[in-house]
Each structure stands twice: as structure tokens, then as C-alpha cells.
A protein has these predicted regions:
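Intracellular juxtamembrane helix-capping segments at the cytosolic ends
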Residues: 1-13, 229-243
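Glycine-rich segments within core transmembrane alpha-helices of 12-TM secondary carriers
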Residues: 17-48, 60-63, 161-169, 254-267
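Central mid-sequence intracellular linker of multi-pass
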Residues: 20, 24-25, 44-114, 295-320
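Interfacial helix-cap and linker-helix signal at transmembrane-aqueous boundaries
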Residues: 39-48, 143-144, 175-176, 180, ...
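A membrane-interface helix-boundary motif in multi-pass transporters
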Residues: 45-60, 186-191, 271-291
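Flexible cytoplasmic loops linking transmembrane helices in multi-pass membrane transporters
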Residues: 82-137, 181-191, 196, 320
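Extracytoplasmic gate region of multi-pass secondary transporters
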Residues: 110-172, 229-236, 240, 265-266
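C-terminal transmembrane helical hairpin of 12-TM major facilitator-type secondary transporters
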Residues: 186-234
């Protein structure tokens, strides 16, 4: 889904609204995390088929229903949509230049893979994914082992940090689009990444010292995810800035590398928390995440860009 999303946004959203459109779409992931975490905790405790197996059955059915709706309702572009009027189609083609975006020029893979702004975005996306997935996957363990929260309540406590991003993400998108009318896109993207990652790094350091106070620990986790969601206006949108025609491919590249961090994160956390109930071990986990966010913020601020790249519209680009 990740590579498909920016490709569709490039065809269905005017450039001046892409920050808010992207954040609103991707924030569905946060809503799913909240609902899924709450429901999974309840199903594990009270569900059918022995409890935890019911989680897979319920989520599997939901996935099938959504897939059917996507297949029936989604179209590549306004030019190919069977249910919009001619007036609407003309509006989109005039506003976005949809006719040009329907074309499939050769992909300049060499230029993409050696593009400094793309590499800087990849570093930022990797850090964001690593940190976020560490919270998603390992937060229930932290809640259980350090804070002593039982499995039924664990779902509630683990879901709370992902509520604020549902609001903060779209608001940051609106603010980013407004600021783009005042400042350059490059400045806006770097500003949101730097502010977000710096705040997250600082709060992660503080998290190591909050002790076993459940309310304070959950409040700090909520602050982390809220600040992290501000970066969505950079890491989930910048592909469209750099090369709208190739945004899906760049998203595929950056998200694949970022997902390597998601795969590695649980193993790294497991290696660092072998005793699990030791607060000092979890403190080291938070310090590692803080360092990753700080370093990636510097990399993106120095090397990132919000401008369309010279190779983005090269119809004669080589496929190598």
C-alpha cells in the first residue's frame, strides 16, 4: 500500500494540498493501531477460539472486506475513473495536470539511488520507522514488564500513545501547506523534520528517568508519538516534492529500507533487555532511539530538499 499511496496522491491531489492529504491518509494507520490494539487486548482475554486465535480471524475478515472495497472504488487517476463527471475530470486535469501523470516514463533508477535528497529522506524515514515500530511492537512488553500492567489493561495503555497522532498529524499537514505559501518547500520540510525529531529525542532521554509511574510513563509516550507525527509532513510527503512521476517508486524504496529497521528493532530490543524487568535496560533502549532521531535530523537538515529534482521529469531517463 505504501508505494501505491503517493502515486495516487500525485494524481488526485493539487500540489498545494499534498501535505494535509498525505497526513490524513496515512493517519488511518494510527487509527488502525488504536482500534487494533484495543480490540486485540480484549480478544486475547475474552475472544472465541481460545482467545488469541480470534485476533487473526477478526483482522483477516476486516482485511478482506477492505480489499474488496478498494478494488471496487479505487482508480489510477481522474482520467480513468468511471464514476466522475466530465466537469470533475476537466477540473482535475486542469489543476493537477493528470494527463501528464497518466504517462509512465522510464524510471531513472541510477539517479534515484544516487540522489542525495532521496538518500537523506531514506535516513529520516528509517529512523522514524525504527522508533515508531519499536513503540508499536515493544510498548506492550514495557507496559507489562516495567509498569506491571495486565494483558486486558495493556491494550488500553498501549493504544493511548497513538491517539494524539490522529489529531496532530493532519494539523501538522495543514500547517505545513500554509507555511509553504510563506516559505520554500525545502525550508518547511526541514523545519518539520528537525522540530519533530529533536523533540522526540529529548523526550526519549527523559523517558529513561520516569520510573514506574504508570500515568507519567504513558503521558511521556503520548508526547513522543505526538511529536513524531509532526514529521509525517516530511517523511510521508517529500517523495511527491522530489519527483511526482516517480513518487510511488521512491516511497517503495524508502519504505523498504525503513522496514528493515522495523524488522531489526524487536531483535535489538530483545538483545538489550534480556532481563526484561530491569529498568536500566529499557533506559538504554530509549537512549539508542534518541541518538538515532538526533543523527537523522542532522542528516536531513543538511542534505534534504523539497524541490523537484532535475531528473524528475526526464522522459528520456535510462532504466539503469
Amino acid at each position: 500500500m505504501y508505494p501505491a499511496t503517493p502515486a495516487l496522491i500525485a494524481r488526485w491531489s493539487a500540489p498545494q494540498y499534498r501535505s494535509v492529504v498525505s497526513t490524513v491518509i496515512f493517519i488511518g494507520q494510527e487509527a488502525g493501531l488504536v482500534a487494533g490494539t484495543l480490540l486485540a487486548g480484549v480478544l486475547c482475554e475474552y475472544g472465541f477460539a481460545g482467545g488469541w486465535p480470534s485476533v487473526f480471524y477478526v483482522f483477516g475478515v476486516v482485511g478482506c472486506v477492505w480489499s474488496a472495497a478498494w478494488y471496487l472504488l479505487c482508480s489510477d487517476s481522474p482520467a480513468t475513473h468511471p464514476r466522475i463527471t466530465a466537469t470533475e475530470r476537466k477540473y482535475w486535469e486542469t489543476t493537477i495536470g493528470t494527463t501528464d501523470l497518466v504517462a509512465h516514463p522510464p524510471t531513472p533508477w541510477r539517479k534515484i539511488l544516487t540522489s542525495v535528497p532521496v538518500l537523506a529522506l531514506t535516513v529520516a524515514y528509517f529512523a522514524c520507522s525504527w522508533g515508531y515500530l519499536t513503540l508499536v511492537i515493544c510498548l506492550p512488553l514495557y507496559m507489562h514488564d516495567i509498569l506491571g500492567v495486565d494483558i486486558a489493561k495493556n491494550g488500553v495503555f498501549s493504544a493511548l500513545p497513538f491517539v494524539l497522532p490522529i489529531v496532530i498529524g493532519p494539523v501538522s499537514g495543514l500547517l505545513a501547506d500554509w507555511l509553504r505559501s510563506k516559505l520554500s518547500t525545502t525550508v518547511v520540510r526541514k523545519l518539520f523534520c528537525a522540530v519533530s525529531f529533536t523533540l522526540v529525542a529529548c523526550i526519549l532521554i527523559l523517558t529513561g528517568y520516569v520510573g514506574c509511574n504508570r500515568v507519567l510513563a504513558v503521558a511521556v509516550m503520548c508526547a513522543i508519538t505526538a511529536c513524531c507525527s509532526v514529521s509525517f509532513s516530511t517523511v510521508l510527503v517529500n517523495q511527491l516534492d522530489l519527483a511526482p512521476l516517480h513518487a510511488g517508486k521512491i516511497m517503495g524504496l524508502t519504505s523498504t529500507i525503513a522496514d528493515l529497521g522495523a524488522v531489526a528493532a524487536p531483535h535489538v530490543v530483545s538483545a538489550m533487555t534480556q532481563h526484561r524487568s530491569t529498568r536500566s535496560e529499557w533506559q538504554n533502549v530509549f537512549f539508542l532511539l534518541a541518538a538515532m532521531y538526533a543523527i537523522s535530523a542532522v542528516v536531513y537538515v543538511v542534505f534534504g530538499s523539497g524541490e523537484r529534482q532535475s531528473w524528475a521529469d526526464d522522459n528520456n531517463a535510462s532504466r539503469d
